[in-house]
């Protein structure tokens, strides 16, 4: 962290080690191996293929530097979402800490741990987007942090999608933050 080693990180034990994983951008998450927030999100969908046509991928981010979030608040949201027709992303560091993804519960021993930010990812069919957005709006005011939401879909062969008109009908103002052009490729697998 410090080029002259004047500041050295302390060795942390469980459950405090969770704080470093979610708060230190140079430490990779053990569950995913990804640095920063521990997930590639849908930014790399052209390579990962996590979200297909007719589907929507959500990123629900909790906390920010200066605000933070406790896992207890994240659990309120994951439990609120779990009963909907969604699937939590398994390649996500918060998913790795869920004791029961079916109910959205998170490990009891980390609920009071506070981190700078964390992202929950999920996927659903496009027709369920309004229901997911309504649930996020319902639960978010109960949390002692801020919540940011992103939603993405895969465009069709003409570059169009059904998500934009759906969001407009629901009254959401949005900006197309990133468009994958399909230039990314999966890494080649070495053959013997």
Q: What role is predicted for each listed range?
A:
Residues 1-15:
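Iron-sulfur cluster-binding cysteine motifs and their immediate structural context
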């Amino acid at each position: 962290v410090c080029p002259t080693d004047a500041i050295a990180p302390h060795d942390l034990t469980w459950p405090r080690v969770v704080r470093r994983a979610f708060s230190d951008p140079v430490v990779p998450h053990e569950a995913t191996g990804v640095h920063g927030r521990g997930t590639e999100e849908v930014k790399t969908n052209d390579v990962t293929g996590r979200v297909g046509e007719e589907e929507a991928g959500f990123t629900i981010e909790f906390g920010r530097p200066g605000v933070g979030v406790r896992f207890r608040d994240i659990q309120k949201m994951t439990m609120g979402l779990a009963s909907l027709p969604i699937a939590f992303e398994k390649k996500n560091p918060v998913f790795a800490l869920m004791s029961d993804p079916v109910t959205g519960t998170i490990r009891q021993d980390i609920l009071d741990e506070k981190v700078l930010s964390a992202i929950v990812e999920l996927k659903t069919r496009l027709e369920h987007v309004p229901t997911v957005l309504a649930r996020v709006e319902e639960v978010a005011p109960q949390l002692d942090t801020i919540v940011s939401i992103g939603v993405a879909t895969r465009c069709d062969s003409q570059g169009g999608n059904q998500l934009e008109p759906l969001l407009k009908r629901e009254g959401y103002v949005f900006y197309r933050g990133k468009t994958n052009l399909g230039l990314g490729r999966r890494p080649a697998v070495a053959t013997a």
